[in-house]
From Swiss-Prot:
Origin organism lineage: Bacteria, Bacillati, Bacillota, Bacilli, Bacillales
Family affiliation: Belongs to the major facilitator superfamily.
A Pfam family reported for this protein in Swiss-Prot or TrEMBL: MFS_1
GO biological process, one term: transmembrane transport
Name of the molecule in the record: Bacillibactin exporter
Regions crossing the membrane: 4-24, 39-59, 69-89, 104-124, 162-182, 212-232, 247-267, 278-298, 302-322, 342-362, 368-388
Keyword entries, A-Z: Cell membrane, Membrane, Transmembrane, Transmembrane helix, Transport
Gene: ymfD
Family matches, as InterPro entries: MFS, MFS_dom, MFS_Efflux_Transporters, MFS_trans_sf, Tet-R_TetA/multi-R_MdtG-like
Localization per Swiss-Prot or TrEMBL: Cell membrane
Amino acid sequence: MKNIIALSSVPLVMTLGNSMLIPVLPMMEKKLSVTSFQVSLIITVYSVVAIICIPIAGYLSDRFGRKKILLPCLLIAGLGGAVAAFASTYMKNPYAMILAGRVLQGIGSAGAAPIVMPFIGDLFKGDDEKVSAGLGDIETANTSGKVLSPILGALLASWYWFVPFWFIPFFCLISFLLVLFLVAKPEEDEDAPAVSEFIKSVKKIFKQDGRWLYTVFIIGCVIMFLLFGVLFYLSDTLENKYAIDGVAKGGLLAIPLLFLSTSSFIAGKKIGKDKGRMKFCVVTGMILLTLSFIALWWNHSFYFLFVFLSFGGIGIGMALPALDALITEGIESEQCGTISSFYNSMRFIGVALGPPVFAALMSNANWIIFILSAFCSIVSLFLVLFTVDAKKSEEEKNLGTV
């Protein structure tokens, strides 16, 4: 249990370190005297750097061990937060140094949160029930961070606008100490394969399992694209249409995320080792997400907005731990970190694309947003139905192959 608590702190801290800045961006724009595009780069550079570095960190964790990569990366993420905090507090023109700090934070986060998923698979190797339950806890921590971040960010910024930056190194240090002292080192093979052999094995995985792996990657990207796009839309709508801002806006943003977090926790506990349940959770989740966007196209008034987005949150919460489990249960641990890193990179691409795409669509008509979102959801649904074979996993497990 202590392993799970410590590892759950990593995605929680990484999510807080990024998402809690979102409600503070309008204030930063004024304080830094920059354009809206420039202030958006504070979020974008973090995601772009992480996208590039995640596969590298995944490979290194497969080669040298999860904990050996995770701990230094937590320190790098904390250092990045400290650079941004120091610059915003003491420098006259801190914008460039804030971006530099965010680059460092992105590098650190690339080797932190994405490594946790294969780490869980290593720690509970051979116990599929514990693996799926652990992944559910990890996704719950991740989504809990999203629930808390708009509220916490608004609260901290109400003191001084730069205070959220100071909490990033503080959170990272706590997570570092938890992982250092509470997480056991998983058993590792004595001899790591040569680089050429490792690359061959990864290519073999994509050749053999690429059909369902590509689907998992695409759906992970789509879900995060829709999630962060919708959060951007909801934040903008609450402030500009309903004149709700500050902590009140943060609390309202947290409502659909709370449903997401709860369903993620329950799904992670119920999935177990059954690939059929994993597929069922993804399919059901994408159906709920599709229906919620169709309903929003029909009516997106204030109350219906939260009702239907909460149903969509339940769908996303069901799908995420199942997607994680499909990878950790379907890929051997020697390559799991690398494969998981590709998956997490796709998720970060979704995070980076969501807000700007939704912002562009919002300049036209809201119904376009909901039609596009429903279309993306239904395409993902059909991909799962026709490319993920639930029966195949039992046969593979009996044969002892990937």
